[in-house]
Each structure stands twice: as C-alpha cells, then as structure tokens.
C-alpha cells in the first residue's frame, strides 16, 4: 500500500519545498469523501503504479485509507517529470466515471500487407460502480487487414458497465503505410 503525508499548508511555497524533497503533490477526492491534500514520495509512487495489477489501488494518507483510481495527472512539459496527480476515491456501490485502458494482442494480418497498427483510443470512458470496473479492454487484432479497424461497439460488453464513448469511434486499426 502506498503511504503519503497530509499537507497541512497548501501554499505554493509548501508545494515547492515538498517537490524539492522528492514528493509528488496529490489531491484525493470523491463522492461522499472530504477532499484531502497530500503528497507521496515520487519514485515509490511511480514504481507502484507500474507494478499494480488493477485500476483501483489503496493509499494511506495520515491515518485515513482510501481506495483510489488515478483520475488525472500533470507532467512538466520540458522534463516530462510527474508533478501533480488527482486521485478519485471510490466507494462501493456508488457509480463513477472512469477511463479504462485498451490493450491489444496478436499480430494483424495487415502488417504483412504493408500496413501499420494505429491505436486511436488508448482509454475508453465508462460509468460503473467500482466493483464492476474492468481492469482493461483486451482487443484481438489478429484478423485486421489494411484499412480495417475495431470500433467501440465491437468491444467486449461487461455487465453493469456503461461505455460512454460513441459507438462509431475507432479504437484500433491498420492503416496503409505511405
């Protein structure tokens, strides 16, 4: 479980001092949860996110424990370093909006016909309760030939999960190389 500290002062000077000490500034919020301003050690936070298996993960700020999902993050445009993260605290049985990653498997037929695999949509917007949240959408791209794509409507449907993206949006496809 990730452990962080609660920020008592939310001034710019305080945030700069924490960043200088290797902390990542974070906000935890959600339906029925009081907003908490916190900070996590940057390197352990990134390492934990890379190794986690599920979208929802536990964090501890002070004496409070939250089940959270990364809602938004900000990076420094020059150094590409993570500088801020918003964590959505989820509550069992309460519907929320999430962005679920798309993963693909297989080698498309179209690659042998001088095609290039294009991932158009990296995340799918869904609305559901946290206990029904899929960890990812897995797409088999093996049958795709040049100028073919998989649309949102072709994705696997999960029970109690409403996909918010339009049905006709391409998720992944094979385009002709120029």
Swiss-Prot record:
GO biological process: translation
Molecular-function annotations in GO: 5S rRNA binding; structural constituent of ribosome
Function summary: This is one of the proteins that binds to the 5S RNA in the ribosome where it forms part of the central protuberance.
Oligomer and partners: Part of the 50S ribosomal subunit; part of the 5S rRNA/L5/L18/L25 subcomplex. Contacts the 5S rRNA. Binds to the 5S rRNA independently of L5 and L18.
Gene3D superfamilies, alphabetized: Ribosomal protein L25, beta domain, Ribosomal Protein L25, Chain P
Record keywords, A-Z: Ribonucleoprotein, Ribosomal protein, RNA-binding, rRNA-binding
Pfam families registered for this protein in UniProt: Ribosomal_L25p, Ribosomal_TL5_C
Protein name: Large ribosomal subunit protein bL25
CDD domains: Ribosomal_L25_TL5_CTC
Gene field: rplY
Any one GO CC term of the record: cytosolic large ribosomal subunit
Family, per entry: Belongs to the bacterial ribosomal protein bL25 family. CTC subfamily.
């Amino acid at each position: 479980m990730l452990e962080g500290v609660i920020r008592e002062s939310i001034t710019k000077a305080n945030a700069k001092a924490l960043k200088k000490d290797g902390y990542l500034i974070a906000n935890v919020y959600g339906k029925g949860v009081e907003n908490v301003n916190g900070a996590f050690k940057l390197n352990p936070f990134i390492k934990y996110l890379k190794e986690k298996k599920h979208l929802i993960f536990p964090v501890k700020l002070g004496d409070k424990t939250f089940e959270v999902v990364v809602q938004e993050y900000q990076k420094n445009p020059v150094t590409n370093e993570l500088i801020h993260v918003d964590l959505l605290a989820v509550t069992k049985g309460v519907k929320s909006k999430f962005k679920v990653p798309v993963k693909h498997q297989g080698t498309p037929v179209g690659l042998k016909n001088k095609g290039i695999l294009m991932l158009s949509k990296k995340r799918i917007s869904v609305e559901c309760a946290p206990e029904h949240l899929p960890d990812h959408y897995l797409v088999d791209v093996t049958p795709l030939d040049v100028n073919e794509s998989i649309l949102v409507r072709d994705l696997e449907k999960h029970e109690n999960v409403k996909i918010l993206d339009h049905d006709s949006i391409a998720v992944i496809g094979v385009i002709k190389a120029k």
